[in-house]
Design a protein with these regions (language model features):
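Active-/binding-site microenvironments in catalytic and ligand-binding cores
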Residues: 1-209
């Protein structure tokens, strides 16, 4: 029997956000307990909240918006690789040792998965180095998933990792919690909200063993 791993971070009022992004608010606007016929909530958050997909439009005005990412890129075989806690920057050299040629979806587990449950943002999270991003582009990867709110070094000042990937329409999925699944081959499903013309969107993401 297949096992399904839910990789998604819960979206809740006051939940973890990247510094400068909108805060999360989930408020009950109509309540049965107060005489309404149904419960209806008002939800406020940014497009890069929790587990989410970055589209090319995140950094390029003429880039592909999130609603136009082909579903074929978001669903299919994926490899989950893991790095020890002392790896703080995932470089091309790190990735070359994993024999990723032929893989279309690469998911990178680091010490960050343990940080996702913390209420406070941790700025020294592990990130994908620009040369690592270029290596993944060079071998034909179409989707990269990471386990913190950004794939880029905090306050990098250049956004080279994002731009290297998104310029080639490589989908970036951030905020994936890889605490439960062991490294290996899986079926990956990531379905961002269909926000028309938007630069990114929260998503429900799972691995199926």
């Amino acid at each position: 029997m297949s096992r399904i791993y839910d990789l998604s971070v819960p979206i809740k009022t006051g939940g973890l956000v990247y510094p400068g992004n909108p805060e999360i608010s989930v408020e009950l606007q109509q309540a049965v307990a107060k005489g309404a016929s149904a419960n209806v909530s008002l939800i406020r958050f940014g497009s890069h909240t929790g587990t989410h997909a970055d589209a090319s439009r995140h950094f390029f005005d003429d880039g592909q918006p999130v609603d136009q990412i082909p579903l074929e890129r978001l669903i299919g075989p994926a490899i989950l690789i893991a790095f020890p806690d002392d790896v703080r920057s995932v470089t091309a050299e790190n990735l070359k040792s994993r024999k990723l040629e032929g893989q279309k979806r690469v998911l990178i587990r680091t010490r960050n998965s343990a940080l996702l449950s913390q209420q406070q943002f941790v700025p020294d999270y592990t990130f994908l180095a620009p040369d690592g991003a270029q290596y993944l582009v060079d071998i034909g990867v179409e989707l990269v998933g990471v386990d913190y709110l950004s794939i880029e070094q905090f306050h990098s000042g250049h956004h080279k990792t994002h731009k290297t990937l998104l310029a080639r329409s490589v989908v970036i999925v951030e905020g994936l919690n890889f605490s439960a699944p062991p490294p290996g081959q899986y079926q990956f499903i990531c379905l961002p909200l269909r926000l028309e013309g938007c630069d990114g969107a929260p998503a429900r993401a799972v691995l199926i063993a």
